[in-house]
Amino acid sequence: MKYITAISMLATAALTAATPLNGVEARWGSGGGGGGSTCDNNQQQVCCASVLSLICLVDVLGGNCNGGSYCCDNGASVGGLINLNLLNCVQIL
């Protein structure tokens, strides 16, 4: 039983180490001097209200988010109310 736990932890560490980080660096915006709290021109701010971030709405009116805020590369889904490109999002710190 301990071997299975050790092997699963080793596999998780190997997958984490193999994850490319060059795409994440490109998505962080300068934010126009806002300390990284705003999105670039090519990105859209998205508010996620749920704990699991499954329900994310585009911030149309520019209001504050009560949940988590993310900058997303929307591409083809610009103008939609529901963000379908959840993998292209980076959380705003």
Swiss-Prot record:
Induction: Expression is up-regulated during mycorrhizal symbiosis with Vaccinium myrtillus. Transmembrane segments: none annotated. Residues 1-26 form the signal peptide. Disruption phenotype: Does not affect mycelium morphology, wettability nor growth under stressful conditions such as toxic heavy metals (Cd and Zn), oxidative stress (by H(2)O(2) and menadione) and plant-derived organic compounds displaying toxic/antimicrobical effects (caffeine, tannic acid, gallic acid, quercetin and caffeic acid). Leads to a reduced capability to colonize Vaccinium myrtillus roots. Disulfide bonds join 39-71, 47-65, 48-56, 72-89. Aerial growth, conidiation, and dispersal of filamentous fungi in the environment rely upon a capability of their secreting small amphipathic proteins called hydrophobins (HPBs) with low sequence identity. Class I can self-assemble into an outermost layer of rodlet bundles on aerial cell surfaces, conferring cellular hydrophobicity that supports fungal growth, development and dispersal; whereas Class II form highly ordered films at water-air interfaces through intermolecular interactions but contribute nothing to the rodlet structure. This is Class I hydrophobin SSP1. The gene is SSP1.
